[in-house]
Amino acid sequence: MKTLLLTMVVVTIVCLDLGYTLKCHNTQLPFIYKTCPEGKNLCFKATLKKFPLKFPVKRGCADNCPKNSALLKYVCCSTDKCN
């Protein structure tokens, strides 16, 4: 009986997705997010550099933090919904 129970526990663990899946916002609205695909382990937020209010113009998942440009400043983080 114990062997059957142990087997069922092992099968359950193997069948579950135990990998960490990061969730990032992907629109300007802060309550909409998506689960990032495998390999994308950062969330990013882009804001306009010259605009006084720092509204995000782009959000999403990334494998590397995008580089700042003349117009956009990127901020990256690695926890759920941190962008």
From Swiss-Prot:
It comes from the Eukaryota. InterPro entries: Cytotoxin_Cobra, Snake_3FTx, Snake_toxin-like_sf, Snake_toxin_con_site, Toxin_cobra-type. Keywords: Disulfide bond, Membrane, Secreted, Signal, Target cell membrane, Target membrane, Toxin. It holds the Pfam family Toxin_cobra-type. GO terms for molecular function: toxin activity. It is found in: Secreted; Target cell membrane. Disulfide bonds join C24-C43, C36-C61, C65-C76, C77-C82. GO terms for cellular component: extracellular region; membrane; other organism cell membrane. Its main location: secreted. Residues 1-21 form the signal peptide. Belongs to the three-finger toxin family. Short-chain subfamily. Orphan group XV sub-subfamily. Non-cytotoxic protein that does not show lytic and hemolytic activities, but can induce aggregation and fusion of sphingomyelin vesicles. It binds to integrin alpha-V/beta-3 (ITGAV/ITGB3) with high affinity, and it inhibits osteoclast differentiation and bone resorption in mice, probably due to binding to integrin alpha-V/beta-3. This is Cytotoxin A5. It comes from Naja atra. The lineage of its organism: Eukaryota, Metazoa, Chordata, Craniata, Vertebrata.
